[in-house]
């Protein structure tokens, strides 16, 4: 439903910090995002201005690190829900205007590189500009890595346990053909009719 993503035309999102000690390529790219955010935004000012958005009880334990790092002067990586993300078009315009040279240079890479940025740059910018409504995206969405949790994923789809699920595949899924057959059956169970774009 549309209200899951927007309220009064403003994106619903969670503003909460997470640790990023990783050495993976993804972790490095997230750190690149935060460098730009810290160049543009003052953490103390943002968290003071939007106190009720950053310290909202709806986030539950997902906000623990945000409370703990309140005295810390810089932004760190925000939680990155692995699901569909609402954006405002103006956010893309603003970020591109501010960091367009870096983004253009990055877009020349044929493959991900340690100097890249991710879409989380735009999301974090949007949150720092106060263009969001507090919403705990973890309360009604779930990401299932199919390599570990294919049975749980299939059950969640069939029973419609969440408003939104992300099914993350990879090349190491055991019994892939059987898992895919069961997953298709779960979707056919809840969506027996073809959608208009399939007709």
Residue map of PLM features:
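ER/Golgi luminal nucleotide-sugar-dependent glycosyltransferases, focusing on the catalytic module
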Residues: 2-199
């Amino acid at each position: 439903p549309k209200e899951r993503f927007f309220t009064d035309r403003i994106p619903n999102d969670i503003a909460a910090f997470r640790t990023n000690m990783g050495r993976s390529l993804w972790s490095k790219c997230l750190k690149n995002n935060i460098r730009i955010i810290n160049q543009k935004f003052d953490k103390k000012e943002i968290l003071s201005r939007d106190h009720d958005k950053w310290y909202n009880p709806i986030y539950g334990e997902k906000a623990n690190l945000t409370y703990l790092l309140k005295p810390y002067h810089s932004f760190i990586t925000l939680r990155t829900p692995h699901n569909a993300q609402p954006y405002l078009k103006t956010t893309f315009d603003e970020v591109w205007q501010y960091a367009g040279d870096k983004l253009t240079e990055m877009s020349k890479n044929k493959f991900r590189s340690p100097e890249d940025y991710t879409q989380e740059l735009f999301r974090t910018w949007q949150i720092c500009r106060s263009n969001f409504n507090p919403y705990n995206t973890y309360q009604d969405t779930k990401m299932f890595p199919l390599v570990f949790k294919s049975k749980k994923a299939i059950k969640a789809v069939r029973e419609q346990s969440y408003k939104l699920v992300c099914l993350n595949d990879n090349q190491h899924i055991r019994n892939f053909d059987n898992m895919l057959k069961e997953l298709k059956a779960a979707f056919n169970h809840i969506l027996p009719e073809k959608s208009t774009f399939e007709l």
